[in-house]
UniProtKB/Swiss-Prot annotation:
Organism domain of life: Bacteria
Gene that produces this protein: guaA
Reactions accelerated catalytically: XMP + L-glutamine + ATP + H2O = GMP + L-glutamate + AMP + diphosphate + 2 H(+)
Binding site for ATP: 232-238
Protein name: GMP synthase [glutamine-hydrolyzing]
Pathway: Purine metabolism; GMP biosynthesis; GMP from XMP (L-Gln route): step 1/1
Database matches in SUPFAM superfamilies: Adenine nucleotide alpha hydrolases-like, Class I glutamine amidotransferase-like, GMP synthetase C-terminal dimerisation domain
Protein source organism: Synechococcus sp. (strain CC9311)
Top class in the EC scheme: ligase
Domain GMPS ATP-PPase residue range list: 205-403
PANTHER family in the cross-refs: GMP SYNTHASE [GLUTAMINE-HYDROLYZING], GMP SYNTHASE-RELATED
Entry keyword set: ATP-binding, Glutamine amidotransferase, GMP biosynthesis, Ligase, Nucleotide-binding, Purine biosynthesis
Length: 528
């Protein structure tokens, strides 16, 4: 059974078959940007499964393998005879060529990585309105030596004679580059050409349409039963709260567990915003004291995470029993979690899908089985950027919708070493200054994350003609599209100066501010 058939009533217009590319999810996101619903499935998805889904088109992703290798991942050859338009990207194009009778060989001294100008030979169909000379992103070590019968060249580059190919009669197309990445200047034009003009899709994947479908699905699933949501204040759980309130009203109970590791003023803001301003009932659980006691003397970051996660589950269990009974638990599973768990993890030797546990929303995945919740996952079709759009449409304020990612364990993992109340107060004040100044400079929405880290060492300083021996604060600001990779943000010097001066002068116990200029990889965004 195809993993997408459990995704609700809507069937995908475009199916992406994943061959291990780091860009497979990005292809799906780019298709969705054209307001066409797309999903990612494993490359072993059979032609029969695809026929049952009845997509308007299929895209074969790139991948790290060589099509002529013994253990190369291959698609069902019957796919070529479905009569559905197919676009092969990089490895996907090479697979198309190889399976249809062409030849792919290792590039001898002509591998292409990075940007390359595309010379258009046939500006029709896939390449309509794509300017010759447009920059495309190349990443391949193999090349097409001979095209299958019925195929012709659409474009070339200096090192790749067959950079784009087509069999117009069978509506089969291939590109040796990656149109989905931002470096490919004409990439979105090609994707629109394929989706709209070749596949004949309609732009019906809109935020409003999703909300209507999600509301109807939730009402149908839960009926008149009670539903529980663990509210963290992040964009996912906040969007869920608004969506569920719209769908089932007072059947929803939100539980906010304040573990004492949130940023300054956040617990008060959340209660004021949800419970009083928007009349969404929130049960506030003050568990600060029990969490900080559990971390007494703990310095190892993984142990801190484990303790916080375990304690969260215990508190959640206790309070859900007290407030319940509840029939349903809302989880913030997003589409990347669905892809990871069932869609694309395939053993190349057997072709079998390998299940990976879906990430749990806000640490509720380890709840005791005797609580017997049924899961409600209204956002499981969406990528993160789509969740933000839904939140805006539902009326969430920008300060929540555009909130920078914040780890579940909160400030506890931005304090290196042991967590104490004194350090938490110090870090809260420093972190608030960072966010205030980045926002005042108009850079908040241009930066993926901007925050402060407290180090477990002290440094010598001079303040008011007196020697000080206090903590240093690390300023961590990164730019990213999805958090998988990130570059350190080049903040203006005058902004860094303002942040540093304010922290040193206003935050008790700090006498030095340093800047983390490490990208991911090799570093991670968070320090713990």
């Amino acid at each position: 059974m195809s993993s997408v058939q459990s995704e609700g009533q809507r069937k995908p217009a475009i199916v992406i078959l994943d061959f291990g590319s780091q860009y497979s999810e990005l292809i799906a996101r780019r298709v969705r940007e054209t307001e066409v619903f797309s999903v990612v499935l494993g490359y072993s998805t059979s032609a029969e499964e695809l026929r049952a889904l009845a997509p308007r088109g299929i895209i074969l992703s790139g991948g790290p393998s060589s099509v002529y290798a013994d253990e190369a991942p291959l698609c069902d050859p019957a796919i070529w005879d479905l009569g559905v338009p197919v676009l092969g990207v990089c490895y996907g194009m090479q697979l198309m060529v190889q399976q249809l009778g062409g030849q792919v060989v290792a590039a001898t001294g002509k591998a292409e990585y990075g940007k390359a100008p595309l010379k258009v030979d046939d500006p029709t169909a896939l390449l309509t309105n794509v300017e010759s000379g447009s920059t495309m992103w190349m990443s391949h070590g193999d090349s097409v030596e001979a095209l299958p019968d019925g195929f012709l060249r659409l474009a070339h580059t200096a090192n790749t004679p067959e950079a784009a190919i087509a069999n117009h009669k069978r509506r089969l197309y291939g590109v040796q580059f990656h149109p989905e990445v931002v470096h490919s200047t004409g990439g979105m034009v090609m994707i629109r050409n394929f989706v709209y003009h070749i596949c004949g899709c309609e732009p019906d994947w809109t935020t409003e349409a999703f909300i209507d479908e999600a509301v109807a699905n939730v009402r149908d699933q839960v009926g008149q039963k009670r539903v529980l949501l663990a509210l963290s204040g992040g964009v996912d759980s906040s969007t869920l709260a608004f969506l569920l309130k719209k769908a089932i009203g007072d059947q929803l109970t939100c539980m906010f567990i304040d573990q004492g590791f949130m940023r300054k003023g956040e617990p008060e803001f959340l209660m004021e915003f949800f419970d009083r301003k928007f009349n969404i009932h929130v049960e506030y659980i003050n568990a600060r004291e029990r969490f900080i006691k559990k971390l007494d003397g703990i310095t190892d970051p993984e142990e801190k995470r484990k303790i916080i996660g375990t304690e969260f589950i215990r508190v959640f269990e206790e309070e859900s029993r007290r407030l319940g009974p509840f029939d349903y638990l809302v989880q913030g599973t997003l589409y990347p979690d669905v892809i990871e768990s069932a869609g694309t993890n395939v053993d190349p030797k057997t072709g079998e899908r390998v299940a990976v546990k879906i990430k749990s929303h806000h640490n509720v995945g380890g709840l005791p089985k005797d609580l017997r919740f049924k899961l409600v996952e209204p956002l499981r079709k969406l990528f993160k950027d789509e969740v933000r759009k839904v939140g805006r449409t539902l009326g969430l304020p920008e300060e929540i919708v555009s909130r920078h990612p914040f780890p579940g364990p909160g400030l506890a993992i931005r304090i290196l070493g042991e967590v104490t109340e004194e350090k938490l107060d110090c870090l809260r004040d420093a972190d608030l200054i960072v966010r205030e100044e980045v926002n005042a400079a108009g850079l908040y929405h241009d930066i993926w994350q901007a925050f402060a880290v407290l180090l477990p060492v002290r440094s010598v300083g001079v303040m008011g003609d007196k020697r000080t021996y206090a903590w240093p604060i690390v300023l961590r600001c990164v730019s990213s599209e999805d958090g998988m990779t990130a570059d350190w943000s080049r903040l203006p010097y005058d902004l860094m100066e303002v942040i540093s001066n304010r922290i040193v002068n206003e935050v008790k116990g700090v006498n030095r501010v340093v800047m983390d200029i490490t990208s991911k990889p090799p570093g991670t965004i968070e320090w713990e």
